[in-house]
């Protein structure tokens, strides 16, 4: 499903085909040529996957055939890279392996642990496993220390990655495993029981929130703007979260998990949590660029 809708605008929950996309309720409707996205939704949909269950993503390129229909930036040829995934070369989204509007490309992401052909090949380690859908774990080969957690996939077009990602061709992907199954209620000695929920066997997101942080810029008409001639690194002057300007999220008085993605072109972040009094709130870092950290 979509990331948490904090704007209260129903249009954010449907397709962008004829839907009025606003980055803030008081901002103008964005032109369709200014924003490109996955699967016709905005923000792009979240992909949830578990280990040992391969993902086949058929990516249709439905962008305009007219190369100038881009609001001044971005290229309509695409190649999709699943960042930090252990994927075969033909499905890695190499920068020159692009396809044109009207075409599609099939990406096969096998969802395997690193070292699956050399480490724990007999699949005896319970820490190397995947949810079985019935509250248990199915053991799999590979190195549990390389368990992935939070990924993203994005356009990887040669010379145009920054522009296409800036326009919206980027989405998050959650990996689920025996260590990180997305069910905080299962206590089997392996599951880390990170904040999530309990209704589903795996992949609960009641208290597990994906957040894409990105700086943007608008032109004088309030439309998304980018400077393609800035080769030193474009930096926007407005911060967004999940493509919303000044969003909010209603929460309960309990622990939450936030999966943060730096979706900016050049900017880096120092992230902190503050209470209403401006005092810092402590938090735990559980993963970094995909991998669950040593614990």
Language-model regions, residue ranges each:
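N-terminal, post-signal-peptide metal-ligating segments of extracellular/periplasmic oxidoreductases
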Residues: 1-99, 223-258
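Short, glycine/acidic-rich beta->alpha junctions
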Residues: 39-41, 132-136, 143-150, 157, ...
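Residues that flank catalytic or metal-binding motifs in active/ligand-binding sites
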Residues: 43, 53, 76-78, 101-105, ...
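Outer-membrane beta-barrel proteins
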Residues: 45-47, 143, 161, 199, ...
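Extracellular/periplasmic metallocenter environments
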Residues: 62-183, 295
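Histidine- and aromatic-rich segments of cupredoxin/plastocyanin-like copper-binding domains
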Residues: 84-116, 213-295
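Low-complexity, Pro/Ser/Thr- and charge-rich linker/hinge segments at domain boundaries
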Residues: 178-205
């Amino acid at each position: 499903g979509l990331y948490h809708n904090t704007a209260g605008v129903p249009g954010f929950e449907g397709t962008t085909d004829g839907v009025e996309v606003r980055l803030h309720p008081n901002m103008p409707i964005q032109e369709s040529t200014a924003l490109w996205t996955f699967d016709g939704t905005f923000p792009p949909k979240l992909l949830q996957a578990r280990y040992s269950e391969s993902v086949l993503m058929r990516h249709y390129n439905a962008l305009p055939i007219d190369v100038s229909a881009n609001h001044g930036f971005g290229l309509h040829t695409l190649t999709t890279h699943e960042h930090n995934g252990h994927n075969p070369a033909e499905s890695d989204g190499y920068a020159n392996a692009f396809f044109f509007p009207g075409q599609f490309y099939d990406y096969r992401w096998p969802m395997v642990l690193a070292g699956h052909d050399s480490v724990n090949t007999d699949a005896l380690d319970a820490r190397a496993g995947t949810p079985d859908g019935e509250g248990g774990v199915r053991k799999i080969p590979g190195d549990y220390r390389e368990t992935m957690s939070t990924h993203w996939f994005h356009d990887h077009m040669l010379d145009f990655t920054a522009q296409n990602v800036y326009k919206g061709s980027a989405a998050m992907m959650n990996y689920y495993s025996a260590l990180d199954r997305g069910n905080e209620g299962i206590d089997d000695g392996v599951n880390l029981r990170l904040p999530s929920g309990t209704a589903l066997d795996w992949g609960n997101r009641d208290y597990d929130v994906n957040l894409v942080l990105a700086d943007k810029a608008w032109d004088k008409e309030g439309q998304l703007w980018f400077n393609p001639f800035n080769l030193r690194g474009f930096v926007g002057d407005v911060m967004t979260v999940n493509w919303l300007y000044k969003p909010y999220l209603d929460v309960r008085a309990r622990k939450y998990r936030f999966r943060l993605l730096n979706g900016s072109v050049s900017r880096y972040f120092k992230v902190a949590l503050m209470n209403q009094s401006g005092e810092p709130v402590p938090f735990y870092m559980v993963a970094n660029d995909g991998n669950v950290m040593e614990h």
